UniProtKB/Swiss-Prot annotation:
Chain positions covered by the region annotation Disordered: 150-172, 437-479, 507-529, 556-879, 949-1130, 1155-1222, 1237-1263, 1336-1369, 1388-1824, 1870-1893
GO cellular component, one term: cytoplasm
Gene: Nes
Region span, Coil 2B: 197-314
Residue list for modification Phosphothreonine: 316, 389
Coil 1B: annotated segments: 56-151
Protein name: Nestin
Length: 1893
């Protein structure tokens, strides 16, 4: 025995020495490995963030791009070469022709010479003949003389003879006489013959001379031509040679460049190959090291196993009993039965040390030992039999756990071999689930690494399952992906079963561990850091170290204690480890649930965060299973290999964990002593460090990174202390590789598997870095895509595809990980993310990742957990939270994006030199966003005034809260997201600025052309409109081509650039707003219900918001597509298809209703749905307006392209008028009309802007100037002429835009009315136009009475314009457009006042007559002393407006065709076009569209305001009519009309519905007097105030009034002159119907507008009533006097609130009389539509009470207000003009807008727009600089006083203003200032608010 013992001890000592040697080698290898890892890390750090592959790819991509560029250049050169060759051929052909011609000429010359010689010969012969004849004649004469002499002699001799017999003499005498007679006759005949012959010869001689001279001349010319052709041939030959030389040089250069690129590419390829070879060498070295390390670890494990076996033999009987028990344990027994030793060492080890098995099993279950797994697996390969205990091989019996495990592919050979064993399956499953998080990533690579080794091992050791192992090793990733894809549900069930089995095994192991004493704290500590670390990261090294620590701590602590102590500690820790694991798992499940409920988006966003959460959840089997199952296939594939590797490592670790427990007592003690020496402080340090790790883990939920760092440090300490660092490092590296695999889940798994199969940790690290670098490159690509979104689409598409791929991968991982949580949110987000420009996905994901990090931190924070944990929030707000969080993520992003977009807009406007206007408009937009919510709520609430005030307060508070919250939330997220957002925004700004510049250049070029045309037109003012139309059409066709090209490119670029920005802005703003909502308790409380509503609405309208591009593209695309036609529709269809593909569910659910209700939703849902949404979600309200703002910036581009394409739109709209009429009628007559009209209004306004900017601006303005000047002399005739010229454009624009708009609503009416209006217009242009409006108004029924009120003449003309009742509604619409245009014009005028705005106005409408505007502005600036100049300034301002409107009218080229029928109509259309033109030339299309978008959104809630806006235009028309009647109002109107308009508008809200008529009349009368005084001051002294107030005949009034009326000037002059036509127009509604029916009869419409304006003195109430009440009684003077507001406005309020107004408007649009009668005349309806569409800005502004702010600001600075209101008015005006254009009332609407611009001058927004746009633009442009300086300064004071009142009143009585607009119209009868009052109170408040905003 002693000898045996000594021999055994000797063997043991030998083994110990060998073990020490191996450990030393392992340590050295570990150190070398660490050094190599550090070296690799340094090399990678040197390489930079991006790997050489990324750089090489970038360089290769750049080189490819360059090659493509060179190739394109080469192709271009070839094309040029071909062209040159063709040119040369053509030149040669011409030369040949010249040669032939030369030859012909030479031949002809020869022939001519021969003919000349022949002629000469003939001439000589004839001369000789003549000489001969002369000689013969002389001879005959001589003979005759001789004969006569002879006869005479005979006769003389006869008497001498004896008388002959009487009979003889008589006979002789007759004979002689006969002879003489015969001879004489013969002689005479001969003479005649000779004379004839001589004459013939002379004539032939003359002819011959002529032919000779011709031949000589022809010969000379031929010679000259020959010489010239020779010179041309020489020059062409020289050019050909030069071109050939150039071509050759280019070819040489290109070849050289190509060679260079080829060389560079080859060099890069060589470098790439060299790097690959280096990497391969490094990988080989690392692999060798890994193999060596693994072999060493296997040997160590083998010795440990032997030692444990010896220890188990030498153990006490108690241990033997335990061993017997453990060995005989039926659960443990199966582990050993069916598994050969070769196949599974773990089974052998438990057999060898059954006593230690109970504890090791649970210990292995919970203690991750990847390194030991590997080592043990290799031990399996190298140790055929480690124990003497025979393990009978048992055929593998299929076991459900085994099947499950195989389904998940968790264990490879281990599972397969031990699968039949239920206990092993159980142990394996929990180990896989528990270790899975830890080894998930490393497992992925271990699966890759081990499969190679394990396959060989399996083949050698596991003959039963070599193929299976090989499969696992070779195609683990593919199997995982395929199996997971195929059996995803089965895997889920299996995962759940595994979780159950794991729990069971943990329970059993816990019981066993409880049986033996446990150092639970240490194990818990070790387990805690283990699990927490696994929860912490994606398989970071800390996790690996923790696994090693757990093993080592357990093993070492066990070593410190006796083997029993080891067993107890191991078993106890197992139980308690299981307990904390369970608790952690439960916590993880709860956190997952909270994450699922509360952070669906967040989980989707961060791939890293997702992986972290995945690891965290994977630690807990249940949570792991849930999120694991939810994880994408890729992550699951990675997880499966990790599971397999984890199981293998787990089983190996079990074995090894059993080994230290099974050491013989002595050797065990020795080892324990060694371990104690090494790790005396380790048990404590593990506990302390585990506790520390647990603590940071708890904190780590909120601060994962910091904790990971702390943990990493702790783990490093433990690793340093632990002797098995070498094993840990492999595990850590494996984990890192697994992490890299998980991180690179998005990348091809095959690559990861290939690297994973390589056991080299270097490769793993490199793969991690490479994956990270790939991800970073992808992110960089995403960022670059975001930045380069605005770059050429081809490049964007390439990057977008890359981004989409990356995003799809990331989104798939993020979405799959929270699929359960965020399947809905993930799908919607993913679809949204995958929306047309997948680049948004990247940005969204980046933003969402940032948000997810923050939200995860916040969610992980107890507060977030508590929040999410709240059952009410979970139950009630799960879906709400999802939506809310989406909204939070989106709304704050929107608010945040709004800011950058606003900055973009500001920069764009700054580029336009409209920074102050942009800032003011942004401020006003901010207030609009807040107060637009007010009009929305205001519509919702019955007490519109009180609720509007309350909503103002609440929304202001909420807006401020949202702003604060958005600031607080946006600040961090902006810091995070602005990285991605700002570059796109900056580039978007650049692109937008560039596009704007291009569009401005286009518009300028078009404007220059228009100026040239307009100059010629000015010279030809009275020429036929057909010539003007032809020119405009030619210019329009050119502009259409240019605008189509630039518009398409701009649309594409802007859509691509802004679509993603809009989406991202909307999403980011919504997310920010959502976070603001969460942060805002008020918002949370109010919005919980509102969120429910908002969620529902989000289901309905959120698509609009969630898919801002989708609905907007749908709506805007409908607008643009209908205007642009198929092009925009194709782009929209592509966007829709992309959005549908990405958001099939959303679009199927949302886009379909959006498509069907798109138009309605854009108006009604934007009004109704967005009202609750805005009311419910203030953040979204704030976001929506910013969304409108981004669309504004987009709108700038869109406006540019729309402006460019507006001509195209006009033509398309003209063609689409019929279709549009059908479509609008097919659609809800009201909503469709409103929506489509609104859309068309926007398009028309944009096109009007474009037209104003391009063609009509200069042409119409010049025409208008001419007309205005002509009007100064003869108001009506010049009005007719100017109306014709302007109306041509206005009609053109109205045909295109208003044509569509009216075509939809008024197409038929316009045709009928236009027919009448044309007939009337041709006979009485003014009266016709006014009758068209009168038709509207009379149809409203109110126009006739207001006509009576307006003036007897107006009444007379209203008789003719009884048809103009409809036109009044059209004028209302036009008034709205005019108000908007007035705002725009006001802004433009203010811009004129403001050099920046003026510059912008120049940039946009420079051709609009900027010069005249400047001159007239200078005149207007000159002051009252220069009243005629101010009138001229108004004229030029009007002309500016007509410029703008001219451009719009150019779009309204058809308007010019109508202008032939009546210049008055053209004037009205010019007014309309001025308003529209002010809309069209809105230099702030971005803001304008933003305002339009924001106001359009707001407009939806403000149909009443739309009506008030319509009344304002009516007032404007009335004001124009009144200015005719009241020259002062126009004069004072221009300088003071704006200010007093503000005052009046402000005061008008005070008047209320009924108060306004009387009070406003009195007040307006007082103001008229004050305006008369102010005008006296403002106007030249020579101009009597009465002239401005009343006298249309007064030249200064005509100048000021006409000029100011020029947009309205025609209407104004018509108002002066046509004041009667307005009355006639009232009586002539059929004409307006006719005019309305004839979309192109805008001149008659404009004339009707003029008539309506004339009638608007009372007709303004009509139009206001038409718009507001849409009830003729309201329009009637009685209604106005009584506060016709009550009827019309009450009806209009009801209809506006209920959408009846829209219906009535549409119906009215269909029939002018119905418009009035149905609650809104066609103008009213269109005004509503315009208001809804364009007025929504004004309307929403008015409703928002932004007017108050705007009025206050305007009160302080009226020109600034005008600028601001012009900005917003331009937006609103553009919308109005668009709506007017869309209404088909643009002519009328333009007139109305012209009048409303005057009224808008009265109205802060509309009034200013009117001042600026209608008269005030002239005022502002000319008189705003002059009169506005005088009058507006006074008006500013007044506006300040009244503006504040009106602001409050507008807030309270914006609706009232809208309601009071008709009433205000009655004051409008008092004078232009009264319409100003009315306009201020009602629409002008809106316009001002929108304008100021």
């Amino acid at each position: 025995m002693e000898g045996c013992v000594g021999e055994e001890s000797f063997q043991m000592w030998e083994l110990n020495r060998r073990l020490e040697a191996y450990l030393t080698r392992v340590k050295t290898l570990e150190e070398q490995n660490q050094l190599l890892s550090a070296e690799l890390g340094g090399l990678r750090a040197q390489s930079g963030d991006t790997s050489w592959r990324a750089r090489a790819d970038d360089e290769l991509a750049s080189l490819r791009i360059l090659v493509d560029q060179r190739w394109r250049e080469k192709l271009e050169a070839e094309v040029q070469r071909d062209n040159l060759a063709e040119e040369l051929e053509s030149v040669a052909g011409r030369c040949q022709q010249v040669r032939l011609a030369r030859e012909r000429t030479v031949q002809e010359a020869a022939c001519s010479r021969r003919a000349l010689e022949a002629e000469k010969n003939a001439r000589g012969w004839l001369s000789t003949q003549a000489a001969e004849l002369e000689r013969e004649l002389e001879a005959l004469r001589a003979a005759h003389e001789e004969e006569r002499a002879h006869l005479n002699a005979q006769a003389a001799c006869a008497p001498r003879r004896p008388p002959a017999p009487p009979h003889g003499s008589p006979v002789r005498a007759p004979e002689v006489e006969d002879l003489a007679r015969r001879l004489g006759e013969v002689w005479r005949g001969a003479v005649r013959d000779y004379q004839e012959r001589v004459a013939h010869m002379e004539s032939s001689l003359g002819q011959a001379r002529e032919r000779l001279s011709q031949a000589v001349r022809g010969a000379r010319e031929c010679r000259l031509e020959v010489q010239q052709l020779q010179a041309d041939r020489d020059s062409l030959q020289e050019r050909r040679e030069a071109l050939e030389q150039r071509l050759e040089g280019r070819w040489q250069d290109r070849l050289q460049a190509t060679d260079k690129f080829q060389l560079a590419v080859e060099a890069l390829e060589q470098e790439k190959q060299g790097l690959q070879s280096q990497i391969a060498q490094i990988l080989e070295g690392g692999q060798q090291l890994a193999h060596l390390k693994m072999s060493l670890s296997l040997e160590v494990a083998t010795y440990r196993t032997l030692l444990e076996a010896e220890n188990s033999r030498l153990q006490t009987p108690g241990r033997g009993s335990q061993a017997s028990l453990g060995f005989l344990d039926p659960k443990l027994k199966p582990n050993f039965l069916g598994i050969p030793e070769d196949q599974y060492l773990g089974s052998v080890l438990p057999a060898l040390s059954p006593t230690s098995f109970p504890s090791p099993l649970p210990n292995t279950l919970e203690t991750p030992v990847t390194a030991f797994l590997k080592t043990q697996e290799f031990l399996q390969a190298r140790t055929p039999t480690l124990a003497s205990t025979p393990i009978p091989p048992i055929s593998e019996a299929p076991c459900p756990p085994n099947a499950e495990v195989r389904a998940q592919e968790v264990p490879l050979s281990l599972l397969q071999t031990q699968a039949p064993e239920p206990l092993w399956a159980e142990a394996t499953v929990p180990s896989s689930s528990a270790i899975l998080p830890e080894l998930e990533e490393p497992g992925g690579k271990q699966q890759g690494h081990f499969p190679d080794d394990l396959t060989s091992l399996a083949t050698t050791l596991n003959p039963h399952h070599p193929t299976l192992e090989a499969k696992d090793g070779e195609s683990s990733g593919s199997r995982v992906s395929s199996i997971f894809q195929e059996d995803e549900g089965q895997i889920w069930e299996l995962v759940e079963k595994e979780a159950d089995i794991e729990v069971k095994v943990e329970n059993s192991s816990a019981q066993k561990t409880q049986e033996s004493g446990l150092d639970t704290e240490e194990t818990q500590d070790s387990q805690g850091p283990l699990q927490k670390e696994t929860l912490k990261a994606l398989g970071e090294e800390p996790l690996m170290s923790l696994k090693i620590q757990n093993y080592e701590t357990a093993g070492k602590e066990n070593c410190n204690s006796s083997t029993e102590g080891h067993l107890g500690t191991l078993e106890g820790p197992e139980k308690e480890k299981q307990i904390p694991l369970k608790s952690l798992e439960e916590k993880n499940v709860e956190s997952e649930k909270t994450l699922e409920n509360g952070v669906p988006v967040l989980s989707e966003l961060l791939g890293k965060e997702d992986t972290r959460t995945e690891d965290q959840e994977l630690m807990s089997p249940k949570g792991t299973l849930k999120r694991f199952s939810s994880l994408g296939k890729e992550s699951q594939e990675v997880v499966r290999p990790s599971k397999e590797g984890n199981l293998e490592s787990w089983t190996a670790f079990k074995e090894e964990s059993q080994h230290p427990l099974g050491f013989p007592g002595a050797e065990d003690q020795m080892l324990e002593r060694l371990v104690e020496k090494e790790d005396q402080s380790f048990p404590r340090s593990p506990e302390e460090e585990d506790q520390e790790a647990c603590r940071p883990l708890q904190k780590e939920n909120q601060e994962p990174l910091g904790y990971e760092e702390a943990e990493g440090q702790i783990l490093e300490r433990l690793i340093e202390k632990e002797s098995q660092e070498s094993l840990r490092s492999p595990e850590e590296e494996d984990q890192e590789a697994g992490r890299s695999l998980q991180k690179g889940n998005q990348e091809p798994l095959g690559y990861e598997e290939a690297e994973g199969q390589i056991l080299e940790r270097l490769i793993e690290k490199e793969s991690q870095e490479s994956l990270r670098s790939a991800e970073e490159e992808d992110q960089e690509a995403c960022r670059s895509l975001q930045k380069e979104n605005q770059e050429p689409l081809g490049y964007e598409e390439a990057e977008d595809q890359i981004l989409e791929r990356l995003i799809e991968k990331e989104s798939q991982e993020s979405l799959r990980s929270p699929e359960e949580e965020d399947q809905e949110a993930g799908r919607s987000l993913q679809k949204e993310n995958q929306e047309p420009l997948g680049y948004e996905e990247a940005e969204d994901q980046m933003l969402e990742r940032l948000i997810e990090k923050e939200s995860q931190e916040s969610l992980k924070s107890p507060e977030e957990n508590q929040r999410i944990g709240k059952p009410l929030e979970r139950e009630n707000q799960k879906s709400l939270r999802y939506l809310e969080e989406n909204q939070e993520t989106f709304v704050p992003l929107e608010s945040r994006n709004q800011r950058p977009l606003r900055s973009l807009e500001v920069e764009e406007e700054e580029q336009r030199i409209v920074k102050p206007l942009e800032k003011v408009s942004q401020d006003s937009l901010g207030s609009l966003a807040e107060e637009n919510v007010q009009p929305l709520r205001y519509l919702e609430e019955d007490n519109c005034i009180n609720k509007s005030l309350l909503e103002d307060k609440t929304h202001k508070s909420l807006g401020s809260l949202e702003d604060r919250n958005g600031d607080s939330i946006i600040i961090p997220q902006e810091s995070e997201t602005q990285v991605s957002l700002r570059p796109p925004e900056e580039e978007d700004q650049r692109i937008v600025n560039h596009l704007e510049k291009e569009s401005q250049e286009f518009s300028r070029s078009s404007e220059e052309e228009e100026r040239v045309m307009e100059r010629s037109l000015e010279g030809e003012n009275h020429e036929s409109l057909s010539s003007v139309e032809k020119e405009d059409q030619m210019v329009e066709s050119q502009l259409e081509k240019e605008s189509q090209d630039s518009g398409k490119s701009l649309e594409d670029e802007s859509q691509e650039t802004f679509g993603p920005l809009e989406k991202e802005n909307a999403e980011s703003l919504r997310s920010l707003a959502g976070q603001d909502q969460e942060e805002q308790k008020l918002e949370q409380e109010t919005q919980q219900t509102l969120r429910a509503v908002g969620n529902e609405q989000m289901a309905v309208s959120p698509p609009e918001k969630v898919d801002p591009e989708l609905p907007k593209p749908l709506g805007n695309d409908q607008e643009i597509a209908r205007s642009l036609g198929k092009e925009n529709q194709e782009s929209l269809v592509s966007l829709k298809e992309k959005g549908i593909e990405t958001v099939k569910s959303l679009e199927t659910e949302i886009i379909e209703p959006l498509e069907t209700a798109e138009e309605d939703l854009e108006r009604r849902k934007s009004i109704d749905t967005q009202e609750p949404l805005w009311s419910t979600e203030v953040a979204r309200e704030t976001v929506e307006p910013p969304e409108d703002e981004p669309p504004g910036s987009l709108g700038s581009v869109d406006e540019n392209r729309e402006t460019l394409t507006s001509l195209e739109k006009e033509s398309q709209e003209l063609s689409s008028l019929g279709k549009w009429n059908v479509e609008t009628r097919v659609e809800d007559s009201q909503q469709c009309l409103q929506v489509e009209e609104g859309l068309q209004e926007e398009q028309h306004q944009e096109s009007l802007r474009e037209v104003k900017q391009e063609l009509p601006s200069s042409g119409n303005q010049q025409r208008w100037e001419d007309v205005v000047e002509g009007k100064a002399v003869g108001q009506e005739a010049p009005l007719a002429t100017t109306g014709v010229g302007t109306e041509d454009k206005a009609e053109l624009h109205l045909r295109g835009q208003g044509g569509e708009e009216e075509a939809a609503a008024e197409g038929e009416l316009l045709q009928d009315i236009v027919g009448e209006a044309w007939s009337l217009g041709s006979s009485e242009p003014k009266e016709q136009r006014v009758p068209a409006e009168a038709l509207d108004n009379l149809e409203g029924g109110a126009l006739e009475v207001p006509v009576a009120q307006s003036m007897p003449e107006v009444t007379e003309r209203d008789e003719d314009r009884a048809q103009a009742g409809e036109q009044d509604s059209i004028e209302v619409t036009l008034g709205l457009e005019a108000a908007r245009t007035g705002l725009e014009l006001e802004q433009e005028v203010v811009g004129l006042e403001d050099p920046r705005h003026f510059a912008r106005e120049e940039a946009i409408p420079p051709s609009l007559g900027e010069e005249s505007v400047k001159a007239k502005i200078a005149q207007g600036l000159e002051g009252p002393g220069k009243e005629p100049k101010e009138a001229g300034a108004l004229d030029s301002g009007i002309l500016e407006l007509p410029k703008t409107s001219s451009e719009a009218l150019e779009c309204q080229g058809h308007e010019e065709s109508e202008s032939m029928e009546g210049w008055e109509e053209e004037e009205a259309s010019l007014e309309t076009s001025d308003h529209e033109g002010s809309d069209a030339p809105q230099p702030r299309p971005p803001e304008t569209e933003e305002d339009e978008g924001a106001q359009a959104a707001l407009t939806a809630p403000g149909p009443k305001l739309l009506e008030p806006c319509s009344p304002i235009p009516i007032l404007t028309d009335a004001h124009e009519l009144q200015p005719q009647a009241e020259g002062i109002q126009e004069a004072g109107w221009q300088p003071e009309a704006g200010s007093e308009a503000l005052e009046r508008v402000e005061n008008e809200p005070e008047f209320g519905l009924g108060e306004i008529p009387e009070g406003l009349q009195d007040w307006e009368e007082g103001r008229e007097e004050s305006e008369a005084d102010d005008l006296g001051e403002t106007l030249p002294d020579s101009t009597p105030l009465g002239l401005y107030l009343r006298s249309p005949a007064s030249p200064k009034w005509d100048l000021a009034g006409e000029q100011r009326l020029s947009p309205q000037g025609d209407a104004g002059k018509e108002d002066w002159g046509p004041a009667v036509p307005a009355a006639q127009g009232l009586s002539g509604p059929p004409e307006e119907e006719e005019e309305q029916g004839h979309g192109s009869d805008l001149s008659s419409e404009e004339f009707e507008d003029l008539g309506t304006e004339a009638s608007l003195l009372p007709g303004v109430p009509k139009e206001v009533a038409d718009h507001v009440g849409q009830v003729p009684p309201v329009l009637q003077p009685a209604c106005w006097d009584q506060g016709g507001e009550s009827d019309g406005f009450a009806d209009e309020e009801e209809s506006g609130e209920e959408g009846e107004e829209e219906d009535a408007d549409e119906e009215g649009a269909e029939s002018g009389a119905q418009w009035w009668g149905s609650g809104a005349s066609g103008g009213g309806c269109k005004v509503q539509d315009i208001a809804q569409r364009g007025d929504p800005v004004q309307e929403s502004v008015g409703v928002s009470g932004l007017w108050d702010d705007g009025l206050r600001g305007a009160a302080a600075n009226v020109p600034a207000l005008e600028m601001v209101s012009q900005d917003s008015a331009e937006p609103s005006g553009s919308e109005e003009s668009e709506s007017a254009s869309l209404e088909g009332e643009e002519g009328q609407v333009t007139d109305h807008l012209d009048a409303p611009q005057e009224v808008t001058s009265m109205v802060p927004g509309v009034g200013d727009a009117f001042d600026i746009g209608g008269q005030s633009p002239n005022l502002d442009s000319e008189q705003v600089n002059g009169k506005m300086e005088n009058g507006l300064e006074q008006a500013e004071g007044q506006v300040v006083l009244d503006g504040d009142e009106d602001q409050e009143l507008l807030l309270q009585g914006q609706e009232v203003g809208a309601l009071k607009v008709p009433l205000v119209a009655s004051p409008v009868h008092l004078g232009p200032s009264q319409p100003l009052k009315f306009t201020l109170s009602g629409v002008d408040g809106d316009s001002w608010s929108s304008g100021e905003d």
